């Protein structure tokens, strides 16, 4: 019994082992088949119309992006064809009737820059010095932001703003006249220009002397250009005319006469340029017209003073910090030439002097550079005790003639 039972047990065990081996073999066969890598078949890649269109759109997008970047670089790196420097600027000037101290101070300040300096006695309209007279008397140039002086006076005259009136600029920003003059904000003066309209702007611009001769019997002087109609909206319309003088051509003499009127309380003189000692001895001021701006000048003064103390003309203080100076800068470019303007007056205890610095050229030419040169000129005058000298008898006591 025991042998028979053992044989059965052995047979049973053998059967179980055989079944297990069969299952393992089957599993191994399945797994091997599953892991077998199928033979790769070469696939032919063809470009569908949809893919071609997608690639064309992508190429156009990249080309547009690249072109935009190039244009941005070209706008930022504007090319200029006019030199900022000149070997001689005073050659051919008629100087026999000018103040020698003022003239030398202007020559030293201008240096080799391509420009002109005009100095005016605001209480008489006498031109004390005019360096590079050919340029000063030429057809003029775009006034850039110095046009803001006449626009501000027009807006004050019409009661549209005073120095504290906030003007909305965009959705969240606003600015008053003092800050707009000090920082030369274009958007502010565009808004004023649109509010005033071309007809009123044109009226006041001509009233303040634009578009007409500023001098009396000065040979070779140009009257500049003030358009009879508003420039096209494509060029910015009256807004651009009022923010940086688009479409306008102003001469240094015209700007000097206007700043002299601001300085003296509202008398717009004919500018006179004596050419001999006899002309100086017999000098008689000539009034062009009286401007009703005396009550407006305190509102102008804060902005013009702010330009020098903390605004666009603060470079004046690099060279001259001894006397109050009020002024306005201007920077713009046209046809490969960049312009830099600074019109100002030094307000001293013994009198005032108006200076206009006008530069033309390339990248080194801009309004703050003109302001720097004006500061240098004021310092030269200060070093030669000019601001300690009272007005000359010929100009201090001479009655103002109203001859036209």
Over which residues does each language-model region extend?
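Bacterial N-terminal signal peptides that target proteins for export
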Residues: 2-11
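Extracytoplasmic/periplasmic proteins that interact with beta-lactams or build/remodel peptidoglycan
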Residues: 19, 23-118, 358, 383, ...
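Active/ligand-binding-proximal structured segments within catalytic/core domains
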Residues: 144-153
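Short, charged, low-complexity patches
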Residues: 255, 366-378
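Short amphipathic alpha-helical signal-transduction/dimerization elements
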Residues: 263, 308, 375-386
